[in-house]
Amino acid sequence: MIQRLVALLLFLSAILIAFPSPLRAQADYKRYFDEDNLPKVREIFSQGRYDIVIQVCEYADRRGQPSWEWRVLHFEALAAIGRYEEAYDEAKKTAERFREDLGALLRLHRFFKIHGYKEDAAARLADLNLAAKAVPKKERTTLDLVHLGEAALILGADPSKVIEQYFGPAKRVQPKGKEVPPGLLEAHLASARLAEAKEDLKKAAESYGEALKLAPTNPEALFGMAKALFPSDREAGTTYLEKTRAEAPLHFGALLLQAESAINFEQYEAATELLNLVESVNPRHPEAHSYRAILAELERNDHTAFEQARGIALSVWRDNPEIDYLIGRVLSRKYRYEEGAEAQKRALAFDPGFLPAKLQLALDYLRLGRVDAAWPLAKEVAAADPYNVLAFNLEVLEKEIASFTSVKTPDFIIRLPPEEAEIYGERVVEILTEAKKVLGEKYGLIIDHPTLVEFYPDQQDFAIRSFGSLGGDGLLGVCFGSVVTMNSPGSITAAKSNWEATLWHEYCHVITLTATKNKMPRWLSEGISVYEEKQRQANWGQEMNPDYRKMILEENALTPVGDMSQAFFQAKDSMAVMFAYYQSMLVVEHLVETYGLEKLRAILADLGEGALVNDAIARHTVPMEEFETSFALFATKLAEAYGPGVDWTKPKPEEMNPRALLSIASYLKDHPNHFEARRLLTEQLLEAKNWDAAIESADAFITLLPEYTGQGNGYTFKALALRSKEDAVGEATVLELLAAKSAEAFQAYQRLIEVNFEKGNWDGVITNAARGLAINPFTERIHYCSGCAHEAKAQPALAVRSFENALRLNPANPSEVRFRLARNLKGDDPAAAKRHLLDALADSPRYREAHGMLIEIVDGRPTTPIAMPPAASPVPAPAPAPSAPKEEPKEKEIPVPGDKPTPAPQ
């Protein structure tokens, strides 16, 4: 790029020096001059050498060159270096001279509009309309089609028709060899800009990609691709930003996007350096000063500096809505939704029709819990711009949420699908109520307004609600302060995670974000939430594991506490993200254990007043360097204490074949404490169905590292072998050990329910049912077994609740569940019992026990006590009789759902 730039500069110098007057008398000479030289000047302009462009354009003007583009490039270059008043004067002259040139009028309209000259911009509309009509249809070039399409959009045409009638035909023109026809590149760029304006970043990326096929080094296409990819693929977006700056080192857009990214990642010094580069070219650049205002707020909590920088940003155009829109959007990205919303209100005060601010304000209101104020704004944007993807998605989301039910208490508004509310709504209230009491008292916070909590069964709805776009895969919940959004525990995304632990985690964010007025770094908020999970229940949260041990002791993966935010921002994969959560929790644990909870509360209070986190920690503990040293020692000792007798070395290929049982066994003789070899041996013994040897090896594995409950743990291996030997008692014993250590051993809980059910151990059934429902409350068998256990313990109210949930989840034998409901209801609610019996008989007319109980209720006989233990000998309902039997069918018993043993834990 540098060599090409030097060549262009030499060429342009030749233009300025070698041709003081025309060398040829031909009338077409000036046109040839334009055709030869304008492409090179455009390239110089795109690379940010505005000073050279101004000189060349002034020379062209003195020569009387006919193309309007010399004048347009002249005033655009003047504006780019901050000479706005001169640029306006030149633009006015150009507007008077070129009233019929569509390309000139488009650039003039854009210049006047983005710099706040509303009357001049409006005046160009009439000129645009006349100029567009003046282009004969048969004579339209590819570039004419692009210009006509852009003019049509400005004049309010339907975007789909513009694509169909103008951009589409222009893009269908085929290149001739390596030569790109004039207008083809522009057609793809115009399509990309249109998609970007409608927030359809996928289509924008596709169009920018087509443009790059034609012009691989075009800065506009490279930067456009960066913007389109950045929200969904930061790594790819960063690559295109770097490519943009390789071609145009001082490209304003690329520099500013890099600065915004640096601000998002709390790299404030880097952001300042990037802004300095922009201002080295244009000291008055409005967006650069907008970012300086943001830095004043986030980095220094300096309100005076904020207002000064904002004032400079508005000095070019005092009513520019873009300034406060940008400020608010970035502040909201940093969870400062109140400040962000106020900024959008200022932007809308400048221009009530400024749609980006209106849409961003709708998002801010959603995150602040002001839902009723958000939807009308989103509708206004959708009405004004029917092709805006985000506005459309918000309309769809509103309809989805409208179908939700609300579970309300004085402290919470819980929104979720009505069918889900019936299943786990009460449990949500129980957990949140406990969390508010425990955590509120612990952190000395009284929240006097309801917290909004929403559960989404659809990942896309969760993403739109939480992020304003698709994405967020892998995230179970998000807290914005007074609003929590969560994936439903029944959603695919939730998988086998413990939703109760997640809910506790998210409500802890409510406490800490409220305490700090959302002025705290992500790492500290996450660290406290994970820490409080473990305080609530020992097997919640995160524990040391082999991966974390290796990262601490062998990979030097601990992030210095002073740079903890980068642990999240620079995480290279999902494991690095999880380790960031874990290390954040360890920092909090170390802080509380060493300095006390009161110091943590004091740090949060300082953050709420605008202090930076490192300053707050140092103020209430020790200097940051000393704190980092003590923490590193703390974390290292934890890692060293994890499996101290375990051999963690990696075997050489010649020492052990991981696929050969004999090779593994031989290696273990010399390395009896080797973690991976022991795991592999146990696994292969199971595959070989050598149950006794597998049990012995699993015991050795458990003894080696009893804390390990991850994939392929000794408890699971041993349980599989014991089950294969039909040793249910031994299997249950080892699974109980696993269940006590892991809050996500779903299959172990299911198996324990079955084993305890068969033994009539009702307390065991109830305990493991609660564990299982904390992961997936939509498992009908768990509710059924829980109901049977409560019935056996003469707890009819709890039994009814469980059986009702089982019935809602479409059991294989609904008649039998209804019979059990009736049996537990008949004492307190005979009418409800009667309804359930009638429904049971409607499905199974020959259900004798149901007939008997119905007669008992109808005749008003005294109700008899529930037989004990009813669950051990369930009363199955007969199958419904065929509708047109040829002969009297035999009575057929339907087995209780789940009688077939469930798979052992994997």
Annotate each predicted stretch with a short phrase.
Residues 46-47, 80, 114-115, 154-155, ...:
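Register position in tetratricopeptide repeats
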Residues 31, 65, 99, 133, ...:
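Short coil turns that delineate tetratricopeptide repeat
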Residues 42, 76, 110, 150, ...:
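Residue-level recognition of tetratricopeptide repeat
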Residues 35, 69, 103, 143, ...:
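Start-of-helix register in tetratricopeptide repeats
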